[in-house]
């Protein structure tokens, strides 16, 4: 980038002169363009294709952010790039057109007239033969050195005027200033015939309105034209001829028009409005292509002409495209004839080349119009490119320059710039706001938002400038002009003896007190000294106003001294007499009389006060000291006045007050009626409402309105999502104490003007929290509103680096008080931030308010705050470019080169912010020494963070996260090395924020060192006079870098940088340092605005020359100095390490032993084999907890450590390990377990290692295949017995299939091992012996609730089934509660009896405390099944289905298709219970009630064996019950009864082998159905499926397994 900056800077100095931008500005612009993705690399700026997108993007950015610095720089750079490019193109095209370059192309001669394609080949640069110009170029030097003087004779034959040669058609190439090109010397002899009229044109020309040939055509006087033009410079001329609309007739133009145009171009330039007007006038009628080209040859130089030809061709292509789309386009002749094409429009078609007569005869009128219009548009573009205008960004309104002149210069520059047309109007308006005088800027800021064009802005400013300026003299002049007609009307009426309401109303006479006349006309001449007389000036007794001798503090003069008082009455009208001195040093004070017009009694009906004329105040304010105490006041709608000493409470007069201004002669001005404000101010103020009543219209105001916080034009509208429908969330109730606090806070915000009453359809809750001080804080829950907003993008990517402040510059820190509450919300967005102030018990309608300012908690508030404050400060940044101003949120830091400059700038910044409506806390203004900003303490030479706590409190993962975040903020300032951050990074592992963490010893030791570092280390402020240096080094657990000055001698660090955490399994140190160098260079440009001057590299790079490729890529474009030296002492705290560039691993075989490695996931072994003579040596390593990749890595590491000092070849079939080992050719940072294993092994070797990868199980014979097979067979060999298989599963919990393959056991054995594991079963099986159902009635019940909508409103049915007899009891309930459960069980006990145990799910109604106490009272055991698994209650679930099906059938039979009436529900439920309990089910011969009350005594069946957990078959058991998939067996010795899966039961026939299969034993069990009591029962329950047979944990091992 540095090289590109140098090239661009040099070009700017060449073509821009004094206005060229600095290298810093160019670098900042290039960085911005790369950051925004507009440039892939800085060198792309040379490509013209990127110029327009860059211009559009920077223009858009300037309009949005109001910052035009980069756009200004780009404008200068673009002008320089275009000038350089045009200069190069011009030199090449000039040679091309004149035949001076490598080509041999020249304008066509007469011999080309009959070859239409010739000129096309000329445009393409083809060689067409030797022409006139080429022959002239071969002249001798003495012939070409002296141009031939242009005379009045024929250029062709030398005869006098009137020869036929004057009409020869030889289109000349005349250029302005052609004497610069020697090859043009003498060309006039060959090209002087350029009258542009073909032979015979005189005879074929027809006059308008006549048919046939004209007998005497009017021709152009060519001799006169040549004489005229010869005196102005061009030696050769082509005369354009106008085509009239009446027909193909040519009307010659006045030669002086061409002469004047050529002279105008030479003197005024192409961009001159005069030039443009003359060209447009000359081309107002359609011209032929021949005439257009010759005209441009006359007025344009060689380079502009070449540019014009290209631009003309582009414009003609546009016409052709339009004509192609529209067959009836005028250029197509309204669809008659062939369509137009480029050859026709350029005059290159057959019969047109060099033949103006043919062009006039063949071209259509529509084509002529298109040709001329395209030529004129191309001329405009060439004028803009050939003579680029000055940069518009430098244009500022001068102190004495009028706004119109400034607007003229600005618009001309912008229109001539390269800005897109759509961006010009916004740029002009933005320049009006920033580049004009302050008073004009203020006028534009107060303009309505509907003014969107430059013309509207200009008209608005001119209209407002018609009034007098706001000065003392301006006020006097304005008031004099306003009152003068009033005085004249009064004088005329007095002279005529008339009175009426049309003039000024007469006040009271100050002599007699009577109305209708004034003191001068009073018939009663009172004597002086009368004690009853009151003075109207001093309010004293005993004298009148003329006799008043009271002196003010104005050197003994009364107010109004110095203003003339004309005679009254008299022949002349009186002059304006005001009670104020119109001087800048005096305050404009007036005497005022206030009269209360109310009807209630008061002590004083009128009072006299002195008030200040303040055109900056919106309203009239009477001081509390001047306001009579018995005059009533009331609360105002806006209870605060802002702008007069801050926020001041205000009240308003309840009665209408008549206000009159007393003139110097004692006369009273026209009284006004108003309701003034009353406030505690130092003096009364007459605002604009009073001044306008006096006839003054003050519109060009300076400063903001006094009753606003921040002008509304600074409000930034919010962006809403497309579905931003109003959100209404009810206000939740608040306790009385918090409600009182909320009411007080709302009233306070209302008085401050932050909120306003609302009727919005939006609502979100508000609440209060108690602060540590005991007071309350108002909070607004805006989460629902934020969800509807489109968040603004970040406008500040991070906090500024404070060490970049110039060393020794004094500092000042400002704090904006309540910044959010000083910025208004856009009016259309306020309703979305409404809230409700509730009342207790709804005693009154709730009061609703909405925010007028930025509310805290809105997602866009911080961004808007930054944008608004930045917009206010932007003019100051432009005005004081040398001032360093840091702005972060509501904190400002100013730095200047001197204390005086800092104080002056600080005062200006404060006044600017206060005028904008912000408040600066005086106690928050910091000056040196001891300045603190953004958590740092700044001195004149250093920047240090504020001290850390002694030892933080760490209890959870979230505490560690917050601590690490704080340390990351301090690392760039303290240089905390990676080794001190390691213990804290270790504690960040985990995903639960509440996971427990402890403050361990490693963290404590690291923290102590960090605290000690914070007391001794600090950043040094940057000295711009010294070179900026950068250094990088490898250290423990990472790499570290620093930007500073004097790093190798007396280190002064300015910024620390660190390598990032590795993202790959292994990262070489060379790559780590490469990334750090790139980061260091980018940080230098971003922070200090410049590239590093000196870069210090580790000493290893000095020994390894040339530099590695990665380092060279990181140094691309670096123009500073590179030094390689030992590690600077500044890195001692990081414990630097040496960087080795030695290659440790290669992929080519090396001389040495060859070893083979392999690992197996089935055996969890890694092996290394190598051949020793005829025998293979083997080493193994086993780890049941390691992955196969780790086993492969450990096997390779074991092979590497066999011969550490001997080159070794390692052959592996693991592509993963082979690729990783090759990447570890140089030292680096591992980040995975496998990488750590390999890095540890490589670090212990001193010899080269080669890693060779082979494919496993390949058929290729040879040594490598043999060795790999040996390693593979050793890794996979294992013979696990059953006990070892169980141990393997206990360690790894692998599945049965993997266990069978790994241990070489059967699938059946593997499943049994897995089923015995309590952790691997989704439904863990309980020990054998827990009965899943009762062997007799009242042993085990199952209870559940089921929903039956037909039984609404009491639609919940509690169902209990006896697991032995299948008897069902059902009760109906409205809700599922503990009371309902207890009522149901009590009913079931009353019907069936008390059970020993009840089994349910784990619902809250079954597990509540009251239910447990109820069961304990009845002595009933209670068990629960799997949470949320209804299939654990198999019998009751089937009973639910049977019950609901029976209810449906009975209801439909009674005609109730949907809901059962409440009156019928009890009867129908009883019917269902009766049908289920008292009738046989299916093929059963007994009913459930019979089974329940008359149970069958179980008899023991044949002897059986059962399979226990060890896999052995145990004898001594007899069958009691045999069901579908399960069996109950009884031990013959202990009488213990247990339930086991049927597949674990087989007959106890000793003569059979123990491996008798199940199908062999089935005939034995086929005949036992006579004594199995459960068989009928199972069929009666409609048959169990495999899923329905699964019971709760603890019931049946079979059920758990089959699930």
UniProtKB/Swiss-Prot annotation:
Residues 609-690 form the Peptidase A2 domain. Residues 1548-1567 are annotated as: Involved in homooctamerization. Residues 750-938 form the Reverse transcriptase domain. Keywords: Aspartyl protease, Capsid protein, DNA integration, DNA recombination, DNA-binding, DNA-directed DNA polymerase, Endonuclease, Hydrolase, Magnesium, Metal-binding, Multifunctional enzyme, Nuclease, Nucleotidyltransferase, Protease, Repeat, RNA-binding, RNA-directed DNA polymerase, Transferase, Viral genome integration, Viral nucleoprotein, Virion, Virus entry into host cell, Zinc, Zinc-finger. One of its GO terms (molecular function) is RNA-directed DNA polymerase activity. Mg(2+) 1 binds at residues 815, 890-891. One of its GO terms (cellular component) is viral nucleocapsid. Residues 1149-1280 form the RNase H type-1 domain. Capsid protein p27: Self-associates to form the irregular polyhedron core composed of hexamers and pentamers, that encapsulates the genomic RNA-nucleocapsid complex. Assembles as a tube in vitro. Binds to inositol hexakisphosphate (IP6), which allows the assembly of the polyhedral capsid. Capsid protein p27: Proton-driven dimerization of the C-terminus facilitates capsid assembly. This is Gag-Pol polyprotein. It comes from Rous sarcoma virus subgroup C (strain Prague).
């Amino acid at each position: 980038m540095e090289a590109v900056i140098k090239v661009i800077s040099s070009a700017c100095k060449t073509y821009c002169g004094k206005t060229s931008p600095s290298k810093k500005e160019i670098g900042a612009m290039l960085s911005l363009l790369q950051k925004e993705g507009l440039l892939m690399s800085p060198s792309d700026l040379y490509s013209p294709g990127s110029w327009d997108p860059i211009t559009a993007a920077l223009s858009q950015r300037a309009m949005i952010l109001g910052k035009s610095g980069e756009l200004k720089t780009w404008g200068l750079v673009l002008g320089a790039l275009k000038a350089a490019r045009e200069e190069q193109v011009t030199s090449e095209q000039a040679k091309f057109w004149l035949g001076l370059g490598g080509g041999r192309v020249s304008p066509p001669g007469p011999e080309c007239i009959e070859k239409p394609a010739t000129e096309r080949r000329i445009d393409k640069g083809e060689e067409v033969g030797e022409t006139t110009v080429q022959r002239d170029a071969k002249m001798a030097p003495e012939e070409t050195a002296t141009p031939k003087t242009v005379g009045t004779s024929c250029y062709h034959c030398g005869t006098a005027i009137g020869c036929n040669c004057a009409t020869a058609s030889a289109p000349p190439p005349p250029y302005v200033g052609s004497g610069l090109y020697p090859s043009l010397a003498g060309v006039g002899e060959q090209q002087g015939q350029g009258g542009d009229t073909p032979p015979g044109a005189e005879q074929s020309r027809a006059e308008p309105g006549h048919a046939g040939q004209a007998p005497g055509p009017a021709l152009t006087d060519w001799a006169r034209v040549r004489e005229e033009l010869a005196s102005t410079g061009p030696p050769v001329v082509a005369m354009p001829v106008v085509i009239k609309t009446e027909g193909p007739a040519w009307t010659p133009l006045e030669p002086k028009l061409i002469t004047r145009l050529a002279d105008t171009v030479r003197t005024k330039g192409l961009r001159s409005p005069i030039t443009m007007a003359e060209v447009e006038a000359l081309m107002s009628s359609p011209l032929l292509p021949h005439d257009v080209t010759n005209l441009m040859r006359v007025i344009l130089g060689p380079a502009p002409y070449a540019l014009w030809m290209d631009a003309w061709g582009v414009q003609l292509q546009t016409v052709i495209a339009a004509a192609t789309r529209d067959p009836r386009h005028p250029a197509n002749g309204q669809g008659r004839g062939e369509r137009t094409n480029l050859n026709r429009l350029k005059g290159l078609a057959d019969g047109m080349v060099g033949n103006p007569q043919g062009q006039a005869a063949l071209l259509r009128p529509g084509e002529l119009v298109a040709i001329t219009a395209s030529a004129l548009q191309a001329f405009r573009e060439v004028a803009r490119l050939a003579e680029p205008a000055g940069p518009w960004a430098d244009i500022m309104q001068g102190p004495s320059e009028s706004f119109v002149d400034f607007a003229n210069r600005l618009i001309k520059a912008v229109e001539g710039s390269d800005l897109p047309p759509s961006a010009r109007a916004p740029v002009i308006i933005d320049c009006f706001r920033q580049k004009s005088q302050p008073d004009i800027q203020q006028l534009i800021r107060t303009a309505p938002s509907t003014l969107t064009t430059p013309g509207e802005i200009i008209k608005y400013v001119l209209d407002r400038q018609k009034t007098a300026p706001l000065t003392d003299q301006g006020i006097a002049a304005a008031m004099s002009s306003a009152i003068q007609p009033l005085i004249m009307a009064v004088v005329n009426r007095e002279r005529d003896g008339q009175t009426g309401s049309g003039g000024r109303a007469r006040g009271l006479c100050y002599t007699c007190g009577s109305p209708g006349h004034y003191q001068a006309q009073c018939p009663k001449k009172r004597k002086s000294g009368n004690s009853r007389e009151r003075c109207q000036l001093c309010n004293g007794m005993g004298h009148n106003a003329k006799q008043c001798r009271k002196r003010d503090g104005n050197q003994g003069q009364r107010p109004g001294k110095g203003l003339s008082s004309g005679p009254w009455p008299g022949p002349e009208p009186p002059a304006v007499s005001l009670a104020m001195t119109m001087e800048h040093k005096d305050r404009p004070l007036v005497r005022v009389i206030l009269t209360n017009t109310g009807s209630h009694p008061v002590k004083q009906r009128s009072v006299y006060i002195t008030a200040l004329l303040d055109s900056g105040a919106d309203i009239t304010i009477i001081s509390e000291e001047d306001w009579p105490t018995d005059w009533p006041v009331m609360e105002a709608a806006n209870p605060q006045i802002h702008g007069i000493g801050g926020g001041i409470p205000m009240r308003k007069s309840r009665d209408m007050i008549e206000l009159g201004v007393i003139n110097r002669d004692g006369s009273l001005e026209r009284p006004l009626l108003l309701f003034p404000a009353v406030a505690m101010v130092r003096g009364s103020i007459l605002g604009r409402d009073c001044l306008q009543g006096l006839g003054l219209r003050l519109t060009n105001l300076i400063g903001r309105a006094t009753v606003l916080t921040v002008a509304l034009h600074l409000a930034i509208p919010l962006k809403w999502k497309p579905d931003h429908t109003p959100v209404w969330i009810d206000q939740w109730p608040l306790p009385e104490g918090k409600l009182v606090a909320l009411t007080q806070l709302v009233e306070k915000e209302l008085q401050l003007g932050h909120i306003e009453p609302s009727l919005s359809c939006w609502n979100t809750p508000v609440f209060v929290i108690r602060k540590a001080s005991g007071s309350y804080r108002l909070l607004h829950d805006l989460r629902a509103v934020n969800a509807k907003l489109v968040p603004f993008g970040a406008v500040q990517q991070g906090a500024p680096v404070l060490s970049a402040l110039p060393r020794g510059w004094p500092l000042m820190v400002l704090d904006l008080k309540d910044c959010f509450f000083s910025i208004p919300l856009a009016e259309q967005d306020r309703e979305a931030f409404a809230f409700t102030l509730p009342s207790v018990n709804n005693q009154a309608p709730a009061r609703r308010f909405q925010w007028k300012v930025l509310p805290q908690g809105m997602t866009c508030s911080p961004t808007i705050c930054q944008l608004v404050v930045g917009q206010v400060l932007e003019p100051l940044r432009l005005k004081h470019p040398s001032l360093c101003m840091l702005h972060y949120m509501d904190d400002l830091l100013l730095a200047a080169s001197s204390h005086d400059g800092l104080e002056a700038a600080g005062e200006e910044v404060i006044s600017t912010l206060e005028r904008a409506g912000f408040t600066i806390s005086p106690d928050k203004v910091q000056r040196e020494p001891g300045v603190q900003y953004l958590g740092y303490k700044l001195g004149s030479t250093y920047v240090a963070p504020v001290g850390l706590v002694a030892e933080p409190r760490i209890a959870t993962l979230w505490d560690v996260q917050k601590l690490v975040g704080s340390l990351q903020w301090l690392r760039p300032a303290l240089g905390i090395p990676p080794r001190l951050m390691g213990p804290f990074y270790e504690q960040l592992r985990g995903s639960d924020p509440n996971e427990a963490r402890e403050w361990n010893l490693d963290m404590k030791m690291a923290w102590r060192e960090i605290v000690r570092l914070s007391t001794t280390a600090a950043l040094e402020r940057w000295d711009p006079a010294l070179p900026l240096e950068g250094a990088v080094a490898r250290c423990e657990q990472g790499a570290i870098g620093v930007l500073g000055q004097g790093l190798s001698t007396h280190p002064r660090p300015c910024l620390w940088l660190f390598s990032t955490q590795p993202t790959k399994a292994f990262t070489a140190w060379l790559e780590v340092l490469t990334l750090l160098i790139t980061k260091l260079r980018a940080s230098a440009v971003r922070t200090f605005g410049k590239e590093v001057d000196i870069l210090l590299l580790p000493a290893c790079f000095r020994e390894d020359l040339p530099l590695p490729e990665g380092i060279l890529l990181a140094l691309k474009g670096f123009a500073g100095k590179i030094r390689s030296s030992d590690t600077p002492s500044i890195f001692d705290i990081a414990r630097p390490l040496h960087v080795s560039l030695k290659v440790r691993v290669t992929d080519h075989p090396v001389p040495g032993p060859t070893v083979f490695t392999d690992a197996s996931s089935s055996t969890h072994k890694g092996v290394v084999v190598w051949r020793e003579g005829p025998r293979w040596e083997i080493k193994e390593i086993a780890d049941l907890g390691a992955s196969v990749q780790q086993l492969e890595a450990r096997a390779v590491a074991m092979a590497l450590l066999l011969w550490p000092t001997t080159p070794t070849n390692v052959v592996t079939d693991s592509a993963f390990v082979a690729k990783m080992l090759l990447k570890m050719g140089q030292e680096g940072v591992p980040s995975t377990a496998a990488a750590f294993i390999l890095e540890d092994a490589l670090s212990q070797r001193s010899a080269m290692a080669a890693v060779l990868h082979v494919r496993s199980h390949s058929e290729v014979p040879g040594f490598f295949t043999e060795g790999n097979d040996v390693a593979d067979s050793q890794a996979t060999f294992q013979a696990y017995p059953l006990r070892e298989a169980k141990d393997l599963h206990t360690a790894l919990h692998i599945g049965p299939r993997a266990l069978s393959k790994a241990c070489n056991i059967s699938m059946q054995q593997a499943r049994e091992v897995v089923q015995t594991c309590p952790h691997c079963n989704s439904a863990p099986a309980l020990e054998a012996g827990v009965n899943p159902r009762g062997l007799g009635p009242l042993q085990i019940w199952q209870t559940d609730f089921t929903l039956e909508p037909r039984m609404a409103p009491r639609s919940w049915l509690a169902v209990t089934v006896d697991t032995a007899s299948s008897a069902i009891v059902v009760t109906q309930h409205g809700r599922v509660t503990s009371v309902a459960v207890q009522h149901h069980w009590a009913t079931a006990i009353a019907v069936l009896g008390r059970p020993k145990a009840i089994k349910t799910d784990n619902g809250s109604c079954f597990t509540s405390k009251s239910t447990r106490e109820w069961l304990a009272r009845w002595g009933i055991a209670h068990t629960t099944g799997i949470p949320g698994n209804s299939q654990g209650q198999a019998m009751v679930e089937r009973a639910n289905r049977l019950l609901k099906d029976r209810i449906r059938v009975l209801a439909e039979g009674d005609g109730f298709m949907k809901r059962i009436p409440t009156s019928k529900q009890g009867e129908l439920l009883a019917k269902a219970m009766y049908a289920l309990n008292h009738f046989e089910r299916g093929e059963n011969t007994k009913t459930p009630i019979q089974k329940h009350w008359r149970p069958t005594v179980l008899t023991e069946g044949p002897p059986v064996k059962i399979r226990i957990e060890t896999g052995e078959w145990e004898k001594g058991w007899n069958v009691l019950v045999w069901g579908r998939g399960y069996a109950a067996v009884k031990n013959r010795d202990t009488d213990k009864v247990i339930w086991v899966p049927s597949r674990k039961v087989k007959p106890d026939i000793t003569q059979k082998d123990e491996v008798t299969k199940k199908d062999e034993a089935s005939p034995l069990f086929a005949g036992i159905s006579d004594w199995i009591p459960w068989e009928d029962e199972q069929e009666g329950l409609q048959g169990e499926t495999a899923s329905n047979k699964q019971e709760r944990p603890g019931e049946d091992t079979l059920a758990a397994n089959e699930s």
